[in-house]
Structures are given as structure tokens and as C-alpha cells.
């Protein structure tokens, strides 16, 4: 039994949150939430820099539990996060993408046209899986990430 998780406020019972979420969304499997100490080295394996900065910013809000890469039964692609707000007792899957909502405007000169095309197809499939999994979600496209960068998280990407 987990009484508390280091780095999570004492009045938040992570075990209860996980139990409630597993009943509400039995198709979703979560690991323990990220905590501030997870960000002390400036890097988390498998997480790109803008995901790292975004998660670090959210973890600094003690009312939020940030679960990394939730596994969803029937989904081949994994969303970036499941964010749970302990004040509203609700959460959402969160997927970050540097593509805009029309899948245009992504510039990376190091990648061939075929690589970009394949990446766009994968991202579209991932978003369709997220939309169809029965769990509330939000997709943050480049436009929203630009706004977040301007207002909240400088140097997000």
C-alpha cells in the first residue's frame, strides 16, 4: 500500500487516484506520477526536450498529477501524458505535437519528404486512436504550443 509518493502533496493519496482511474477507465494503465525530483538532471529517457519542459512545468503545480505515457488497451500508439487535476477530480490524455492542426508547416530540413510523410501518417493514426479510446483528451498542436511558449514556458522548443 502506498501511503504517499515522495514529491506529491501529503493530502493526495496516489493509490486512491490510481484505483479510481482504473475503475473509470479500465482500458488505461498508469505508472506512478512524475515528481519534481524526476526533472533534476534536465533529462528523462525517451522524452524529447519540449515534452520534458512541458511536464516539468505541470509537475510544479501541486494540484496536478502528471502520468507519463499511459498505456491504453487497443491502442498501438501511446499518448504523451495523462494529466489529473486533484482539485476538479478529473483528467485528460495529452498529446503534444509540433505539427499544426492541418499537418502542414512542420519544417525539419534533416528529414526526407518520405520520412515526414510517414511521420505525419503515424501522428494522424495516433490521434485517431486517442479520439476513439473513450478517455477525455486534448491534442496540443504547434499553434497551442506556441501560445504556451509565449505565455508560460519560455524556450519550450
Per-range role (PLM):
Residues 1-157:
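Nucleic-acid endo/exonuclease domains
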Amino acid at each position: 500500500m502506498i501511503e504517499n509518493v515522495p514529491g506529491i502533496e501529503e493530502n493526495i493519496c496516489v493509490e486512491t487516484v490510481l484505483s479510481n482511474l482504473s475503475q473509470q477507465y479500465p482500458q488505461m494503465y498508469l505508472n506512478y506520477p512524475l515528481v519534481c525530483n524526476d526533472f533534476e538532471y534536465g533529462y528523462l529517457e525517451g522524452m524529447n526536450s519540449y515534452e520534458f519542459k512541458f511536464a516539468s512545468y505541470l509537475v510544479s503545480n501541486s494540484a496536478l498529477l502528471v502520468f507519463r505515457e499511459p498505456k491504453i488497451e487497443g491502442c498501438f500508439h501511446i499518448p504523451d501524458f495523462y494529466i489529473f487535476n486533484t482539485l476538479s477530480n478529473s483528467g485528460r490524455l495529452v498529446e503534444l505535437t509540433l505539427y499544426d492542426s492541418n499537418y502542414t508547416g512542420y519544417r525539419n530540413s534533416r528529414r526526407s519528404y518520405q520520412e515526414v510523410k510517414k511521420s505525419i501518417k503515424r501522428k494522424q493514426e495516433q490521434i485517431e486512436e486517442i479520439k476513439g479510446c473513450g478517455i477525455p483528451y486534448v491534442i496540443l498542436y504547434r499553434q497551442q504550443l506556441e501560445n504556451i511558449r509565449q505565455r508560460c514556458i519560455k524556450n519550450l522548443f
